[in-house]
């Protein structure tokens, strides 16, 4: 299984962190490949060039998220990876630089997207159970959405549908954009991936001041 690991070549911390992600991926039978994302200023250029709008169905949360440079940069990074998945026509694992692979439960059948961590910053309540795939039921603002986009499997047809949705409906925070309207989301248990810290890829984009936002 191949994995794309999203990082920022302009932010040294994400490079070191992505190297650790690679190490953990190899340990569990995955072939990792670093994938350079875009800092907010370049993401804004990409959005303008591709005539992308913003998904703002009404709730204030979407407007707040869309106003953040880190949110825009993160989403464009994932969008570019989805395009790469379609180009290669291969089921692929998507990881962010602060993801850590901890098991082989990623290696299970799924339909469109397989979320690799049901518990985000919490302990894994499923750690001593048999590997399985379950329906993803997390809901936010009336939509079934991902909760964190730091680790998931995606099939080419699902990547294509997400790309279509981005151009038709507009973009927002990645984990709010990946939703039941476009794809079927399932979750692997016990977790295959965890996020190593609460400073996410999205936050790295927003907090770092070594590049022009």
At which residue positions do the language-model features occur?
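An acidic/histidine-cluster motif and surrounding catalytic segment
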Residues: 1-95, 99-213
């Amino acid at each position: 299984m191949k994995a794309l690991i999203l990082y920022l070549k302009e932010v040294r911390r994400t490079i070191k962190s992505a190297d650790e992600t690679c190490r953990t991926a190899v340990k569990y039978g995955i072939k990792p490949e670093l994938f350079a994302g875009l800092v907010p200023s370049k993401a804004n250029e990409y959005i303008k060039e591709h005539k992308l709008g913003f998904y703002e169905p009404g709730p204030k949360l979407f407007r707040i998220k869309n106003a953040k440079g880190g949110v825009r940069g993160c989403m464009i990074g994932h969008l570019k990876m989805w395009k790469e998945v379609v180009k290669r026509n291969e089921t692929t694992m998507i990881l962010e630089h602060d993801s850590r692979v901890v098991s082989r439960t990623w290696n299970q059948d799924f339909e469109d997207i397989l979320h690799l961590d049901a518990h985000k910053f919490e302990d894994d309540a499923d750690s001593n159970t048999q590997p399985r795939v379950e329906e993803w039921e997390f809901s936010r603002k009336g939509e079934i959405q991902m909760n964190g986009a730091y680790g998931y499997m995606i099939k080419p047809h699902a990547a294509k549908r997400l790309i279509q949705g981005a151009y038709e409906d507009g973009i927002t925070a990645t984990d709010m954009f990946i939703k039941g309207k476009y794809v079927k989301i399932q979750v692997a248990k016990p977790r295959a991936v965890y996020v190593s810290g609460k400073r996410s890829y999205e936050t790295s984009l927003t907090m770092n001041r070594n590049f022009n936002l």
